[in-house]
Amino acid sequence: MSVLIVGSIAYDSVESPAGSVERALGGSATYGGLSCQFVQVLHEQPSTGLVGVVGEDFATEDRSILSSAGINLDGLEVAPGETFRWEGSYHGAMAEAETHATHLNVFEHFQPAVPDHWKQPSVLFCANLHPEIQRSVIEQTTPARLTMLDSMNLWINIAKPSLLDVMTAADLVIINDGEARMLSCLLYTSPSPRDH
């Protein structure tokens, strides 16, 4: 396996200044996998494998979107119940999402099991997951070149010690500027010229 991606596969309902969508295919593993496969196809590289969980309501056409992009779905688990759902909106510069509702559904008890034939990928991408789950994925694999992880403000707020721990096992951490400030506990305030 060239690239192994572990994370969420979801249905998103999103509002933005440009419009809105209901129950669109989303999730961190979905976007990571499609982006990775796009780049790999351009460079004629080997495959991307995805490990995640969906519910019985996961549409055949959405599975086809992933498989027709060349993503290997041997690690996709179908569990009883509904697929993870997220509802939110983007405003202004669209740098951060505002969450309106999160329905974990089958994702709530997701414990990824990396298939044996995928345990030595060239690149491991732990997409947005609880840091303890990211740690378990890292412990199941021995990436040859690069270990990346993605995180978000939720995990900084509720699982900061676990996040700091798993970050030590990664070569690259992906967060936005607001999350970087949260994580570092630094709030920059510009001094007023009158303060000098």
Predicted regions and their residues:
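Conserved N-terminal subdomain of the carbohydrate kinase-like
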Residues: 11-23, 38-125, 139-144
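Short beta-strand segments
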Residues: 6-7, 101, 127, 150
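Short glycine/threonine-rich catalytic loop with a Thr-x-Gly-x-Asp
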Residues: 24-28
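Conserved beta-alpha-beta core of the PfkB/ribokinase-like small-molecule kinase fold
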Residues: 122-188
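Structural beta-sheet core signal
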Residues: 5, 49-52, 149
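Single conserved hydrophobic/aromatic residue that forms the stacking wall/gate
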Residues: 188-196
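Positively charged, low-complexity intrinsically disordered leader regions
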Residues: 1-15
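Histidine-anchored nucleotide/phosphate-binding helix
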Residues: 30-38
